[in-house]
From Swiss-Prot:
<dbReference type="InterPro" id="IPR036373">
    <property type="entry name" value="Ribosomal_bL17_sf"/>
</dbReference>
<protein>
    <recommendedName>
        <fullName>Large ribosomal subunit protein bL17</fullName>
    </recommendedName>
</protein>
<dbReference type="InterPro" id="IPR047859">
    <property type="entry name" value="Ribosomal_bL17_CS"/>
</dbReference>
<dbReference type="GO" id="GO:0022625">
    <property type="term" value="C:cytosolic large ribosomal subunit"/>
</dbReference>
<dbReference type="GO" id="GO:0003735">
    <property type="term" value="F:structural constituent of ribosome"/>
</dbReference>
<comment type="subunit">
    <text>Part of the 50S ribosomal subunit. Contacts protein L32.</text>
</comment>
<dbReference type="Pfam" id="PF01196">
    <property type="entry name" value="Ribosomal_L17"/>
</dbReference>
<dbReference type="GO" id="GO:0006412">
    <property type="term" value="P:translation"/>
</dbReference>
<keyword id="KW-0687">Ribonucleoprotein</keyword>
<comment type="similarity">
    <text>Belongs to the bacterial ribosomal protein bL17 family.</text>
</comment>
<keyword id="KW-0689">Ribosomal protein</keyword>
<dbReference type="InterPro" id="IPR000456">
    <property type="entry name" value="Ribosomal_bL17"/>
</dbReference>
Protein backbone atom coordinates (compact mmCIF):
# COMPACT_ATOMS: atom_id res chain seq x y z
CA UNK A 1 0.00 0.00 0.00
CA UNK A 2 1.18 3.49 -0.72
CA UNK A 3 -0.59 5.32 2.07
CA UNK A 4 0.98 8.68 3.00
CA UNK A 5 3.70 8.43 0.35
CA UNK A 6 3.83 11.86 -1.26
CA UNK A 7 4.99 12.61 -4.79
CA UNK A 8 4.39 11.01 -8.15
CA UNK A 9 6.49 8.11 -9.43
CA UNK A 10 6.03 8.98 -13.14
CA UNK A 11 7.24 5.48 -14.16
CA UNK A 12 10.85 6.32 -13.28
CA UNK A 13 13.30 5.21 -10.63
CA UNK A 14 14.36 7.73 -8.00
CA UNK A 15 17.66 8.78 -9.61
CA UNK A 16 16.00 9.31 -13.01
CA UNK A 17 13.23 11.33 -11.36
CA UNK A 18 15.73 13.45 -9.44
CA UNK A 19 17.79 14.14 -12.57
CA UNK A 20 14.68 14.95 -14.61
CA UNK A 21 13.35 17.45 -12.08
CA UNK A 22 16.81 18.99 -11.64
CA UNK A 23 16.96 19.57 -15.41
CA UNK A 24 13.36 20.80 -15.60
CA UNK A 25 13.87 23.19 -12.67
CA UNK A 26 16.95 24.60 -14.39
CA UNK A 27 15.03 25.08 -17.63
CA UNK A 28 12.15 26.78 -15.84
CA UNK A 29 14.48 29.18 -14.02
CA UNK A 30 16.42 29.89 -17.22
CA UNK A 31 13.46 30.37 -19.60
CA UNK A 32 10.73 31.22 -17.03
CA UNK A 33 8.21 29.13 -19.00
CA UNK A 34 8.36 25.52 -20.21
CA UNK A 35 5.91 23.11 -21.80
CA UNK A 36 5.60 19.64 -20.30
CA UNK A 37 3.01 17.06 -19.32
CA UNK A 38 0.50 18.08 -16.66
CA UNK A 39 1.65 15.58 -13.96
CA UNK A 40 5.29 16.62 -14.43
CA UNK A 41 4.31 20.29 -14.20
CA UNK A 42 2.39 19.68 -10.97
CA UNK A 43 5.31 17.80 -9.48
CA UNK A 44 7.83 20.41 -10.68
CA UNK A 45 6.11 22.99 -8.48
CA UNK A 46 7.32 21.03 -5.45
CA UNK A 47 10.93 21.44 -6.66
CA UNK A 48 10.94 25.05 -7.90
CA UNK A 49 8.90 26.84 -5.22
CA UNK A 50 11.30 25.96 -2.35
CA UNK A 51 14.26 27.04 -4.52
CA UNK A 52 12.74 30.49 -5.05
CA UNK A 53 11.89 30.77 -1.35
CA UNK A 54 15.52 29.89 -0.58
CA UNK A 55 16.70 32.59 -3.01
CA UNK A 56 14.76 35.32 -1.20
CA UNK A 57 17.43 35.48 1.52
CA UNK A 58 20.87 35.73 -0.08
CA UNK A 59 23.62 34.02 1.90
CA UNK A 60 26.54 31.76 1.12
CA UNK A 61 24.80 28.87 2.87
CA UNK A 62 21.62 29.34 0.84
CA UNK A 63 23.60 29.58 -2.40
CA UNK A 64 25.34 26.31 -1.54
CA UNK A 65 22.00 24.65 -0.78
CA UNK A 66 20.61 25.87 -4.11
CA UNK A 67 23.72 24.61 -5.93
CA UNK A 68 23.37 21.22 -4.25
CA UNK A 69 19.82 20.99 -5.62
CA UNK A 70 20.49 22.35 -9.14
CA UNK A 71 24.22 21.67 -9.81
CA UNK A 72 24.39 24.74 -12.07
CA UNK A 73 26.07 28.02 -11.11
CA UNK A 74 24.23 29.96 -13.83
CA UNK A 75 20.87 28.89 -12.38
CA UNK A 76 22.00 29.75 -8.84
CA UNK A 77 23.10 33.21 -9.99
CA UNK A 78 19.76 33.89 -11.69
CA UNK A 79 17.84 32.61 -8.66
CA UNK A 80 19.61 34.89 -6.20
CA UNK A 81 20.24 37.95 -8.41
CA UNK A 82 16.91 38.15 -10.28
CA UNK A 83 14.19 35.85 -8.96
CA UNK A 84 14.81 36.23 -5.22
CA UNK A 85 14.48 40.04 -5.26
CA UNK A 86 11.56 39.86 -7.73
CA UNK A 87 9.52 37.59 -5.45
CA UNK A 88 10.66 39.16 -2.15
CA UNK A 89 7.19 40.49 -1.33
CA UNK A 90 5.29 37.37 -2.47
CA UNK A 91 4.67 34.66 0.12
CA UNK A 92 4.67 31.56 -2.07
CA UNK A 93 2.78 30.73 -5.24
CA UNK A 94 5.59 31.67 -7.63
CA UNK A 95 4.47 29.40 -10.47
CA UNK A 96 1.38 29.12 -12.64
CA UNK A 97 0.22 26.04 -14.58
CA UNK A 98 -1.77 26.60 -17.78
CA UNK A 99 -3.30 23.57 -19.49
CA UNK A 100 -2.70 23.53 -23.24
CA UNK A 101 -4.50 20.53 -24.68
CA UNK A 102 -3.20 17.07 -25.45
CA UNK A 103 -0.04 15.80 -27.14
CA UNK A 104 -0.52 14.51 -30.68
CA UNK A 105 1.32 11.20 -30.35
CA UNK A 106 -0.11 9.72 -27.16
CA UNK A 107 -2.88 12.15 -26.12
CA UNK A 108 -1.04 13.02 -22.89
CA UNK A 109 -2.39 16.17 -21.17
CA UNK A 110 0.09 19.00 -21.71
CA UNK A 111 0.63 22.20 -19.74
CA UNK A 112 2.78 25.29 -19.58
CA UNK A 113 4.39 26.02 -16.23
CA UNK A 114 5.61 29.59 -15.83
CA UNK A 115 6.81 32.02 -13.19
CA UNK A 116 3.95 34.38 -12.31
CA UNK A 117 5.71 37.75 -12.58
CA UNK A 118 7.29 37.28 -16.00
CA UNK A 119 7.90 40.52 -17.87
CA UNK A 120 5.80 41.33 -20.96
CA UNK A 121 8.76 41.15 -23.35
CA UNK A 122 9.57 37.60 -22.23
CA UNK A 123 5.92 36.62 -22.59
CA UNK A 124 5.85 37.88 -26.18
CA UNK A 125 9.08 36.07 -27.02
CA UNK A 126 7.73 32.81 -25.58
CA UNK A 127 4.49 33.17 -27.54
CA UNK A 128 6.45 33.32 -30.82
Amino acid sequence: MRHRKSGRQLNRNSSHRQAMFRNMAGSLVRHEIIKTTLPKAKELRRVVEPLITLAKTDSVANRRLAFARTRDNEIVAKLFNELGPRFASRAGGYTRILKCGFRAGDNAPMAYIELVDRSASEAEAAAE
